[in-house]
Amino acid sequence: MLRRTLLKGVAATAAMGVCAGRAAAQSVLKIGICIPMTGAGFNAVGRQLQAAIKLYTQQHGDVVAGRKLELTIRDDGGVADAAHRIVQEMIVNDKVEIIGIGITPTALAIAPLITEAKKATFVMSSGASITTTKSPYFVRAGFILSPQSWIMAEWARKNGSKRVVTLVNDWAPGVEAETAFKTRFVQQGGEVIESIRIPLANPDFAPFLQRIRDLNPDAAFIYFPGTQAAIFAKQFAERGLAQSGIKIVGPGDLTTDDNLNDMGDQMLGMITAGPYSAAHDSPLNKSYAATIEKDNHFRPDFVSVSGYDSMHLVYEALKKTNGNTDGDALLAAMKGMAWESPRGPISIDPQTRDVVDNIYIRRVEKINGQLWNTEFETFTAVKDPMKPPAK
């Protein structure tokens, strides 16, 4: 009888140990982040995102709603197939509960996986309107190109540009930027005399620069990703197009804060529309920008603040769900969320799961020997005007 009682006690203790072990295991919350850390043109995206994610977790800790966060960041090189493989491994092998993804091609590649797995996924550096329509579990606290292009068209037309040329890369974000700009510019009574699309990989700008010179528009609306904008702007200036009176306008990518000083004084006076500048005048941003630069030796840009805001979205949603990572529960918590970001006030549109934020008109100016995107006009709480219907 005593032996039986002891055995029961041992069994009960073992069962309690198993339960405790399960509880301890359950308290760890795995977040898998797939971004480009290498690869021509996109490695800067990963660098900015990683710095912002690190800063947010340092400031807010790694325990949320009683669950210890375990972040895994993997490099997809900006390659869609690599991202698909990595995210599949994260879901199946690593048992991650929340996913973070970087640029447009990789986000589109993983959309079917995310929908099937029903994993809440924060999109950090995809500017294409279509992205959040590709999975009901995508949510974006980053940026969208269409509102920037739309606002840029409105501002350019109201400030004297009548005839413009558009020049973009032939991929989803470029086409969307072009479409938004053209739509709004024509609505405002302007004329788009030619729309030029060029290859995404290693484009030769020379013939396109000559074409712009021959057309002699009032302005050229330009959109290129990564480092291509800096190369184009430099060649534009070297070939004398700036002196011809043709203005360059574009979304914020054109004069990204991280690269601006390397672009040189030919960028002075260039006008862009974007959701964030490292020079944004608020106490929160001054602290944020100074800390990022101090810790990493580069300026934060719009990609950086997208990563920072994405982490805020995840942390606050987990607090609302008390640590529950069910995809539908997290998405419900994220929809309609609003907060003060280093970029200014932002929110998540409950219908589209997309960011709503201010779009600032900025001029490149030299202050204390450095080039900055100085904001001088604000369009508040701008939604994506070109948004396709959400799924």
Regions found by a protein language model. Give the residues of each.
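Periplasmic-binding protein-like
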Residues: 90, 94-103, 122-124, 165-168, ...
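Solvent-exposed, acidic/polar segments of extracytosolic/periplasmic ligand-binding ectodomains
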Residues: 29, 338-391
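Extracytoplasmic "Venus flytrap"
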Residues: 32-52, 74-80, 167-175, 227, ...
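Beta-alpha junction/loop-to-helix N-cap segments that form part of ligand/metal-binding clefts
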Residues: 28, 47-48, 63-132, 198-205, ...
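Signal peptide-proximal N-terminal region
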Residues: 50-71, 187-189
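Extracellular/periplasmic Venus flytrap/periplasmic-binding protein
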Residues: 85, 128-130, 136-239, 276-287
